[in-house]
């Protein structure tokens, strides 16, 4: 009898798990149940659709429902899984169009429920024109409302918030950001996040205002939002609001089924994406990860990680053996010409974990100074004082900041020491780098500090 694999959720991890399962076991019965109207789309691309970088939102769909069905993967859209019954190996499903509820049996279950936007308790937060960005429909709604708006408020200052600031400014909108930290992108160390905030303010045609160390006390309006009042007493008019105050893992049905959560509040899995209950796997934004430097549990949801985990979950659910060892918190984004990237531990994160850190911040040209496209890059390199192990890197600049960070990312996997980084044989030609790359220069300074 063929194996029946049920997957809950189908955006990134779930879609990857379904496709991989069908390729591994062509005779298996593979089903995706999703409360969404679409599957397998790039939610990471939504800010760029909103910006108008491309006009057709269909380009965000990686694989259509019709393509899945043709391959033998059955898609059940607008079907919400409301309960998992592990003892009976069944799920309870509610059809959101007909309200019909029914049971479905499984041999293997893969949970890929993702994450949901966190909405703080703010007075009148349910007024019209207050949005969060998670689904394809959210992106479509935000773009349509943006086109009719002049002033937009963003609550929060993380990755998505920065991408949306860029999108709105590009479309000639005025933006006010309310951020509870001293600088936006507070996941970075302050030397870097302060430079990012300065760049945004100086390169936005005076359209951006950032209210740091403040929060929203209430939204103003009767039917739709017309204004914002902050905890510090600032009040201003606005046409729409984006709440971008972080996300949380969707774990309610897992908890109800008795599946163990980790210390981060996400589903706890082993390296084979197995949960605490046999034949139930989990992957993507709903699961806890392991930081490969500190070997501690973390929750850092990214689309690239979700795809890797979906693949590993499928292999193991189909009877194979594959491990996903963890993450390095590698990330990249941009604000207009500014590239922003990081990998590994920031200095503040490393210190919280007990590392005795040494760091350097250096600014240097990204290629030969006589090349017309030369730009500056600012790099922060962090190491452990005792072992000299490189712990992480952060880089920003209008030049190629991200390729320096990617180089460090590879080194982190091999426990690279500062001295090892000095020996890396990087490529050189005037259009691509300086003869002594900024990465090598930073390592030299770090070595001097360590000795």
Q: Where in this protein do the model-derived segments appear?
A:
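Catalytic nucleophile loop
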Residues: 11-14, 158-161, 314
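A Rossmann-like FAD-binding core segment of flavoenzymes
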Residues: 27-29, 71-97, 104, 170-271
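Beta1-alpha1 glycine-rich phosphate/pyrophosphate-binding loop at the start
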Residues: 2-74, 166-191
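Rossmann-like dinucleotide-binding cores of NAD(P)H-dependent redox enzymes
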Residues: 60-61, 151-153, 159-218, 300-306, ...
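FAD-site-proximal beta/loop scaffold in flavoenzymes
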Residues: 126-149, 220-229, 235-315, 407, ...
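Flexible, glycine-rich terminal cap/loop adjacent to redox cofactors
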Residues: 2, 8-12, 20-27, 35-36, ...
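Glycine-rich dinucleotide-binding loop and its adjacent helix/turn
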Residues: 111-171, 209, 263, 269-271
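A conserved FAD-binding loop/helix module that cradles the flavin
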Residues: 269, 283-346, 431-450
């Amino acid at each position: 009898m063929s194996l029946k694999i049920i997957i809950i959720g189908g955006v990134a991890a779930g879609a990857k798990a379904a496709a991989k399962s069908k390729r591994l076991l062509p005779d298996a019965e593979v089903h995706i149940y999703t409360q969404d109207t679409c599957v397998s789309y790039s939610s990471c691309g939504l800010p760029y659709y909103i910006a108008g970088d491309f006009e057709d939102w269909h380009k965000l769909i990686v694989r259509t429902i019709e393509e899945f069905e043709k391959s033998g993967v059955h898609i059940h859209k607008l079907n919400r899984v409301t309960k998992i019954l592990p003892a009976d190996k069944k799920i309870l499903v509610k059809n959101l169009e007909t309200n019909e509820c029914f049971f479905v049996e499984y041999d293997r279950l893969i949970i890929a429920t993702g994450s949901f936007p966190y909405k703080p308790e703010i007075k009148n937060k349910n007024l019209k024109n207050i949005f969060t960005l998670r689904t394809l429909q959210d992106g479509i709604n935000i773009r349509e409302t943006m086109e009719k708006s002049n002033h937009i408020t963003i609550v929060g200052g993380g990755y998505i918030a920065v991408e949306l600031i860029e999108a709105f400014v590009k479309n000639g909108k005025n933006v006010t950001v309310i951020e509870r930290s001293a600088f936006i992108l507070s996941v970075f160390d302050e030397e870097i996040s302060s430079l990012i905030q300065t760049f945004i303010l100086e390169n936005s045609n005076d359209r951006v205002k950032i209210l740091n160390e403040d929060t929203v006390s209430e939204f103003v309006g009767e039917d739709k939002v017309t204004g914002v009042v902050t905890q510090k007493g600032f009040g201003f008019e606005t046409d729409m609001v984006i709440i971008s105050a972080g996300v949380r893992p969707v774990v309610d049905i897992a908890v109800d089924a008795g599946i163990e959560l980790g210390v981060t509040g996400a589903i706890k899995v082993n390296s084979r994406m197995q949960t605490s209950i046999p034949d139930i796997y989990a992957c993507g934004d709903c699961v806890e990860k392991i930081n490969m430097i500190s070997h501690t549990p973390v929750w850092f949801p990214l689309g690239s990680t979700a795809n890797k985990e979906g693949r590993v979950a499928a292999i193991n659910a189909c009877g194979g053996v594959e491990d996903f060892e963890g993450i390095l918190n590698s990330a990249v984004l941009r604000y207009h010409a500014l590239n922003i990237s990081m990998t590994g531990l920031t200095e503040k994160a490393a210190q919280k974990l007990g590392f005795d850190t040494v760091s350097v911040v250096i600014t240097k040209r990204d290629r030969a100074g006589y090349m017309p496209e030369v730009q500056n890059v600012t790099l922060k390199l962090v190491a452990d004082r005792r072992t000299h192990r490189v712990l992480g890197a952060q880089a920003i600049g209008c030049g190629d900041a991200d390729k320096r960070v990617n180089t460090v990312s590879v080194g982190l996997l091999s426990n690279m020491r500062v001295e090892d980084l000095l020996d890396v044989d990087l490529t050189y030609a005037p259009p691509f780098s300086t003869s002594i790359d900024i990465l090598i220069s930073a390592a030299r300074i770090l070595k001097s500090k360590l000795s």
